[in-house]
Amino acid sequence: MRFTLKKIFFVFLTLLIISIGYLLLQSVDLQRIRELLHDSEKFDLESLKQASLEIRKEIHYTNYLFSGYDNFTQQFSDEETLKQTSLNDKCKLVFTQWKESHPDFEFKTFEPEYERYDKSSDRKELFFKERINQLRKRFEKDSNNKNKQFTLSRQDNKTISQEYMEHVNRSKNVLQFMADFVSMMRLYGKCFFGRELDDELKSIYNEFRGKLFPFISSQAPKFRKSGETEEFGWPIYDNENNIIDRKTEFGDNPIEFLQKNSKGKGIVISVSTRYAKDAMRLIKILRALNNRLPIQIIYKNDITKKNIELLEFAAVATPEELFDPETIRDGAKFMPELNLLEHYKNYGSEFPIQDLTFVNIAGCVSRPYRFSFPGYSNKILAMLYSSFEEIILFDADVVPTVNPQEFFDSKYYKSSGTYFFQDRSLRDFNDFIETNFFSTLFPSNEKSIETIFDIPRVGEKTFNNKYMTGWRHYQEAGVVAYNKMQHFLGILMMFPLALWSEPVQSSIWGDKEMYWLGLSMAGDENYEFNKYAAASVGEKTTEQKYKYYPNSDSNEVCSTHPGHIDDNGRLLWINSGFSYCKKNGYFRDKGKFPFSTFELNDLVELYNSPIKIRAGLVPPDLPNQREPGSPPDTKPEMEFRKSWKSRKKDTDEINEKLPEGQEPYDFISEWGPQKGWVKNGICSGYYYCAYDKITSYSSEKEFDTGTLFEFDTKSCELYDYLSKIWHTGGSKMKPKVKLETEKLGTGSDKEQXKDATTVRLRI
């Protein structure tokens, strides 16, 4: 057979076309067929839940490894060589490597929504539900689909699944960055804090200060003593606690400056004009309790001149001036039988002049972050920028009922350099994704960069606390006693928590959990909480006709005020001032039980009077909702929450979804309380009733029990006295004064009082 050139050409062309067609089939049709053959993804609810479980296992904190771990360990031939290497050499290596491998490393806030950690990353079924609802709404909105039924195609499911995995991968990357960032902070503390540094380490120390803490500027706060006009810089002390210099700038490394130049003990209050009235009341309460600790008011150019004058007046005026009928006429109606001017000495009050300093930190935050610290986060700035080494941080609206020195003298503070207080044990729960997130920020894994650098790992104390075992509320931060130098890294750890928008902001309530979280993130578990959780303080309900569970033998204390009681049954402080209800007047609540049974005049008098503290009730603690260690399998906690539905309903639940025509329940006679804290609509929802005997969550016993504290007559008289002080303490009247400067010596904190000059204001 002869092959002509023409035939050869056609054969070649045919083979080429077949080859191209085959390749196209391979890349398109066969690829599509291959995809279909391998497309086994299921989208039923159980399959989605199983996929969620696999994701939770994948993102579990035990799988976290510092990004620089392998690069670092590869520089050592064996484990023994690594152990023999000095801390200085390890520090130089780890920071140099990190700089080389991450040249653009800097703090990130993750503020834009498209950058954020997605808390639905472990809930594929929830993600699908939300996206399907969006598709359905879009379908129904389209006028062309009026008579059509919404259906979800397999391709729709696949698109949602792909989008879900994009969110998961983004969240993984964000979590890795955040955990790496916190690891770098721990290494920074280990390598540089409290150590003698050579020039190379000093250079690294200063360089990474800017990378880790770019929000801290080099400008020092401006200090001004009460009654003076001159502002001065940060006080520098010698070894005998004499002030030898003032600094208006922190120098090359503000972190080093702040750590080395904080001295003395004192009270710190973050105040703006919004909270100035509460702060005036607090200062007068402190004087009634004979406080002799110096006070620093931390602000950011956000207190008016008038309010500054009123705060100064509260701090230095004589009792005659404080309780002058013209000054306190708004508060004179409260307990008229108690004449403060005649009786204050009967309560042991000396009303010492307060050593008050205003600390303006407006310039201390770098310009790009000036508006990144609103509200509660100002308290974290106040901790850092107070010049005290040991602080009691007060919210402006708290009321201490003991001399503040007692917080420093407590066994908890003496043993740990901290004294924290527990919140109410409300039955509000958190989710796996939240506790697992925070666990990833803790040093907890054996295979870790922290182990190599001998940084302590956290254990049962952290993982077994109330928050980490599934409950939303653990710490109440109205009062925090804190030794800054002993726990300096813990303060710094709070800043990324305050600046990262998600998942932090939706996982904790303001700053409340940040104090113990910051310490655990630092690998520092040397912190202590008060023995008892928060109590409901007020009057025990004694008349059956006013009780929400009239046939129960559980004690009941209803109040808008949580209080905090020490091991010996003494009330230490309360939240939210002394008003019976500061959110609204009686008018909104007059139709709500038990006030619906009151005579109107009696209700008006109740709302216009301070709360009477006669008892404090601490409800029983809750069992773990989640086992320690954030187990990826959430079925046990879901089953536990499901079991609540089989319990009888409390007054905050029983009126939900009532059958049409059925009268709502004011109270429940047939059974007793099921929860220790039952929320009420009174006072805009700030009113809670506490119970010390509830149906047990355990099948092994009938009841869980708490503790009722009934205060003695002397204590109750003191609380009434303090309530009168508080109600007369927030006058907005601008006093007519002349200034007389005099030397102030408190006698208790020598280092704070040596150069202290104050003023006495005369009406």
Curated annotation (Swiss-Prot):
E.C. no: 2.4.1.-
Residues that span the membrane, as ranges: 8-28
Induction of expression: Induced during biofilm formation and Up-regulated in response to treatment with MUC7 12-mer, a cationic antimicrobial peptide derived from the N-terminal region of human low-molecular-weight salivary mucin.
Lumenal side: 29-763
Annotated GO biological process: mannan biosynthetic process; protein mannosylation; protein O-linked glycosylation
GO cellular component term of the entry, any: Golgi apparatus
Compositional bias annotation for Basic and acidic residues: 649-659
Membrane topology, Cytoplasmic segments: 1-7
Residues carrying covalently attached carbohydrate according to the record: 71, 157, 169
Principal EC category: transferase
Membrane topology per record: Single-pass type II membrane protein
Metabolic or biological pathway, per its Swiss-Prot or TrEMBL entry: Protein modification; protein glycosylation
Segments for region (Disordered): 617-659
Keywords assigned by UniProt, alphabetized: Glycoprotein, Glycosyltransferase, Golgi apparatus, Membrane, Signal-anchor, Transferase, Transmembrane, Transmembrane helix
GO molecular function: alpha-1,3-mannosyltransferase activity
Subcellular location: Golgi apparatus membrane
Role of this protein: Responsible for addition of the terminal mannose residues to the outer chain of core N-linked polysaccharides and to O-linked mannotriose. Implicated in late Golgi modifications.
Family as reported in the entry's similarity comment: Belongs to the MNN1/MNT family.
Protein's recorded name: Putative alpha-1,3-mannosyltransferase MNN15
Gene: MNN15
